UniProtKB/Swiss-Prot annotation:
Quaternary structure (record): Homodimer.
UniProtKB keywords: Aminoacyl-tRNA synthetase, ATP-binding, Cytoplasm, Ligase, Metal-binding, Nucleotide-binding, Protein biosynthesis, RNA-binding, tRNA-binding, Zinc
Pfam families recorded: HGTP_anticodon (PF03129), TGS (PF02824), tRNA-synt_2b (PF00587), tRNA_SAD (PF07973)
Binding residues annotated for Zn(2+), in chain numbering: 333, 384, 510
EC number: 6.1.1.3
Source species of the chain: Cupriavidus pinatubonensis (strain JMP 134 / LMG 1197)
Protein role: Catalyzes the attachment of threonine to tRNA(Thr) in a two-step reaction: L-threonine is first activated by ATP to form Thr-AMP and then transferred to the acceptor end of tRNA(Thr). Also edits incorrectly charged L-seryl-tRNA(Thr).
One Gene Ontology term from the biological process aspect of the record: threonyl-tRNA aminoacylation
The protein's enzyme class: ligase
InterPro entries (UniProt xref): aa-tRNA-synt_IIb (IPR002314), aa-tRNA-synth_II (IPR006195), aa-tRNA-synth_II/BPL/LPL (IPR045864), Anticodon-bd (IPR004154), Anticodon-bd_dom_sf (IPR036621), Beta-grasp_dom_sf (IPR012675), TGS (IPR004095), TGS-like (IPR012676)
Gene3D superfamilies for this protein: 3.10.20.30, 3.30.54.20, Anticodon-binding domain, Bira Bifunctional Protein, Domain 2, Threonyl-trna Synthetase, Chain A, domain 2
Record's protein name: Threonine--tRNA ligase
GO MF annotation terms: ATP binding; metal ion binding; threonine-tRNA ligase activity; tRNA binding
Length: 635
């Protein structure tokens, strides 16, 4: 008998081998119809997979995240099937699942047009309605290579030829189309009902710029129509909020080809930057951090000791001077260890918290650069905590509380926490990792937060806590990290004198809350659609006169606001007041003050809040009180 244990703990027994589909049928017709795949002892398999031993089994439907991934993977193959039907000369390459969708790369003699995409999507719908069965076949490698070569599919043949000869090859067949894939796939094309092709872009074969340029068709696929509609609406909102457009329209920053991946900050954009930096500086000082500054360029020997030269060199900008090799720092940690090492440290000095708004540079591929979100030159709110093993929990707890408080001040109330655990390849003993992982768990538990654990996702030198913030349109952004480093202090010779006068290695906690300033400012701009709260807005107030006779009064109001620390300016142009109001409203200024003769004579201002909200006429002192409250409350 074969015993199948289901997710609810119940068991079903079968006299002999049984497929996932047959198990689903034994539970109920509805489940059998909904089944997309199975999960056998944690591994995803097709519904046709035959079970010949005792296992734990979950039936995967479109209600499961794994089920949606199977739908997307299968839709990528449906896309390739449709392309081959319409354009037989096109050659197929690869088609993986990505976040919210999939893509497939093709080699074809001409670029695909928007009209082609519409025709391909229509053909995909036709193939879905045919509800053709999707079957898995096992081939040996050489026969599979010969098959694809005979079909003129040189790219697919090349992929298969790179697989070890003794490894079985899985091919999936639907109708006239056959493709290489590890699977699993939906049982038939009729399961694929909700999809949309999004765009076409260029992509190099195997990601190598020296290879041929292919065409990558992107698509999205979902279990339900309403899920896809919500996603497409979110994309429309994201397009409106694109920080690159806002940067231009609000005159905050620009990028140009002469400095790829590096930002030219304009006065208003730099004002926002300074508001964020000064806020973070105040929070770090209050939390017991000492701010430091380390060199931008350091000798190769230091990067060799830290391991960056061996493991990270291709992402570093390097240079030579007087026959010595140097690198522009891609991160701040080795420099902070040098400060720790400068002088003899005692256990009484710990924990030592060193913070730096450190400018770093990483040689990211030009094709990966994206506005402020992916750059080559960036500044981090970086800090490193040197502490004893006994202090890990308290320091991690304090950091977690600080991070949540900062996110709350910036308006991010929904924060997800993930704990990345030991990878297969790692430094340090299991005992040390047990202690490190449990220390981070204890800290998170002490803070009362829920977290998701990601086995195998930690760095080789230690486990990591990640902080993911959700923005106004539901997108998740990973910003903060807390990483426990068991390796760098040893590589760079960091030590302190313990209470018993022995020499010990400190534990090193790498931590950041915002991450890259550039990226965080991009997230902020998109979250608020450019309408930054008053405490962050580059211009908090614009004072406008109706006629020349109020110009002096308007200027006096501005000077009064400036002296009280607010960011204000006067618009004294000889233009209609409606024109001025409209122009500054488009610049998303939090408050517009209008002054005429009545306001001047009474020492008052007519106040309009952003969004064309008329707050009426009030004394200047009352407006100042309101604005100060906004700034204090981070409104």
């Amino acid at each position: 008998m074969i015993a199948i244990t289901l997710p609810d703990g119940s068991r079903r027994e079968f006299p002999g081998p049984v497929t996932v589909a047959e198990v689903a049928q034994s539970i109920g017709t509805g489940l059998a119809k909904a089944a997309l795949a199975g999960k056998v002892d944690g591994n995803l398999v097709d519904t046709s997979y035959s079970i010949d031993r005792d296992v734990a089994l979950a039936i995967i439907t479109d209600k499961d995240a794994d089920g949606v991934d199977v739908i997307r993977h299968s839709t990528a193959h449906l896309l390739a099937y449709a392309v081959k039907e319409l354009y037989p000369d096109a050659q197929v390459t690869i088609g993986p699942v990505i976040e919210n969708g999939f893509y497939y790369d093709f080699a074809y003699k001409r670029p695909f047009t928007p009209e082609d995409l519409a025709a391909i999507e229509k053909k995909m719908t036709e193939l879905s309605r045919k509800d053709e069965k999707v079957t898995r076949e096992v081939w040996n490698r050489d026969e599979a290579v010969a098959l694809f070569e005979s079909m003129g599919e040189k790219y697919k043949a090349e992929i298969i030829a790179s697989i070890p000869a003794d490894q079985e090859i899985g091919l999936y067949r639907e109708g006239k189309f056959v493709d290489l894939c590890r699977g699993p796939h939906v049982p038939s094309t009729g399961k694929l009902k909700v999809f949309k092709l999004m765009k076409v872009a260029g992509a190099y074969w195997r990601g190598d710029a020296n290879n041929e340029m292919l065409q990558r068709i992107y698509g999205t696929a979902w279990a339900k129509k309403e899920d896809q509609e919500a996603y497409l609406h979110m994309l429309e909102e994201a397009e409106k909020r694109d920080h690159r457009k806002l940067g231009k329209s609000l005159d905050l920053f620009h990028l140009q080809e002469e400095a790829p991946g590096m930002v030219f900050w304009h006065p208003k954009g730099w004002q926002v930057w300074q508001a964020v930096e000064q806020y973070m500086r105040g929070r770090l000082t209050a939390a017991g951090y000492d701010e430091v500054r380390t060199p931008q360029v350091m000798d190769r020997s230091l990067w060799e000791k830290s391991g960056h030269w061996q493991n990270y060199k291709e992402n570093m900008f390097v240079t030579e001077s007087e026959k010595r090799d140097y690198a522009i720092k891609p991160m701040n940690c080795p420099g902070h260890v040098q400060i720790f090492n400068h002088g003899l440290r005692s256990y009484r000095d710990l924990p030592l918290r060193l913070a730096e708004f450190g400018a770093c540079h990483r040689n990211e591929p030009s094709g990966a650069l994206h506005g402020l979100m992916r750059v080559r030159g960036f500044v981090q709110d970086d800090a490193h905590i040197f502490c004893t093993e006994e202090q890990i929990v308290a320091e991690a707890k304090a950091f977690n509380e600080l991070a949540f408080s900062v996110y709350d001040d910036f308006g991010f109330k929904d924060v997800a926490v993930k704990l990345s655990l030991r990878p297969a390849q790692r430094a340090g003993s299991d005992e040390v990792w047990d202690h490190a992982e449990e220390g981070l768990r204890l800290a998170l538990r002490a803070c009362g937060v829920d977290w998701e654990e990601l086995p195998g996702e930690g760095a080789f030198y230690g486990p990591k806590v990640e902080y993911h913030i959700k923005d106004a349109i539901g997108r998740s952004w990973q910003c903060g990290t807390l990483q426990l480093d068991l390796v760098l202090p040893e590589r760079l010779g960091a030590e302190y004198v313990a209470e018993d006068n022995s020499r010990k290695r400190p534990v090193m906690l790498h931590r950041a809350i915002l991450g890259s300033f550039e990226r965080f400012l991009g997230i902020l701009l998109e979250n608020h659609a450019g309408a930054l709260p008053a405490w962050l807005a580059p211009e908090q107030v614009v004072v406008m006169n109706i006629a020349e006779s109020q110009a002096e009064y308007a200027e006096n109001v501005v000077q009064s606001l400036l002296k009280q620390g607010f960011r204000a300016k006067a618009d004294l142009r000889n233009e209609k007041i409606t024109y001025k109001i409209r122009e500054h409203s488009l610049q998303k200024i939090p408050y517009l003050l209008v002054v005429g003769d009545k306001e001047r004579d009474a020492n008052q201002v007519a106040v309009r809040a952003r969004g064309n909200v008329d707050l009426g006429v009030m004394p200047v002192s009352a407006f100042v009180e309101r604005l100060q409250q906004d700034v204090t409350n981070k409104a």
